[in-house]
Regions:
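Extended, charged catalytic domains and RNA/DNA-binding interfaces, predominantly
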Residues: 7-297
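Positively charged n-region of N-terminal signal peptides that target proteins for export
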Residues: 1-7
Length: 299
């Protein structure tokens, strides 16, 4: 009997060591994988469909000008919010990389143009390089002289301020060129709270704990939670550029104010357009109005 209990104790101790070791490796992201950019369908919208779209407009208009329909605010699971909502605990459907966005814009929405605008604050060299490659690939699928759809490279400057004077709202940045020689080494993130929160070690550890709980509660889908840990680890391991080092591919450029953002955009080798996102999105808007006694002035 003593031998049995001794053997059982050794076995229990061995299992405990294995479980703890496994948990530790999972906690620090060793079992997670970074999402690739994907591979879009190497085909364009059928010419018959494209010509039908054009003829339908001309049939109802006296002008030879064509109205173009597009989307300037598109996220993939390279954005933290989209990744979070793709998790099994939210009944998400898993990864949706840039290639998926390309295919959806072309074959499902039949858009004339679209802009990939993932949150710059969550960007890393891995994501930015993959995004550029997929934007180029999406455009290569069509005739450059008569494209069925144009894909633009962009990013979202996700700024959050602590007070009215320093809250500027989000801005979607659209870059004209897609050739690497004209592009910045990284998108330009919004400095301050928005950027700091992504790289806060305490926040990352909290995320790791939450994901481990979800992984052990849903073992069949644990890999997706491990991938989210790897996603956050990749962000924290990618430094923010300091001083005049913005043109460094190994760090993330940032701008604290719209003035600084526009200054850095003007220094690029490509033209750009900036479209305000607005201030009406959840915690992104200021919580400075006391709504317990709303008045016309406060609202």
């Amino acid at each position: 009997m003593r031998i049995f209990f001794k053997s059982f104790s050794y076995l229990f101790f061995l299992i405990l060591v294995v479980v703890l070791t496994y948990t530790l490796f999972a906690f620090y992201g060793y079992f997670g994988s970074l999402e690739p950019g994907g591979n879009s369908i190497n085909s364009e919208l059928p010419k018959k469909v494209l010509n039908s779209k054009i003829r339908s407009q001309l049939r109802h208009s006296n002008s030879s000008k064509q109205i173009l329909f597009g989307d300037t605010h598109v996220h993939t699971t390279y954005s933290s919010d989209a990744f979070l909502w793709s998790l099994p605990m939210y009944n998400g459907r898993g990864p949706h990389p840039v290639s998926d966005a390309c295919d959806y814009a072309r074959f499902c929405s039949a858009l004339d143009f679209w802009v990939i605008s993932d949150h710059a604050e969550a960007s890393t060299p891995h994501k930015w390089n993959n995004t550029i490659e997929q934007v180029q690939s999406c455009n290569k699928s069509t005739d450059p002289e008569n494209p069925d759809m144009i894909t633009f490279l962009g990013f979202e400057w996700t700024q959050i301020g602590d007070n009215r004077e320093e809250h500027y709202g989000h801005k979607n940045v659209i870059l004209k060129e897609i050739d690497s020689e004209y592009l910045p080494q990284s998108p330009i993130a919004a400095g301050g709270d928005s950027l700091n929160n992504f790289r806060d070690p305490n926040r990352v550890n909290e995320t790791r704990i939450n994901m481990m709980v979800q992984a052990y509660s849903d073992l069949g889908n644990r890999q997706r939670y491990y991938d989210f840990i790897a996603y956050n680890t990749d962000i924290t391991s990618s430094p923010v550029c300091t001083g005049s080092a913005d043109d460094n591919k190994d760090c993330l450029a940032s701008a604290d104010t719209p003035k600084e953002l526009f200054t850095k955009l003007n220094a690029l080798k490509t033209d750009s357009i900036v479209i305000p996102h607005g201030n009406t999105w959840g915690f992104y808007s200021l919580s400075l109005i006391h709504i317990s006694e709303p008045t016309r002035r406060t609202i």
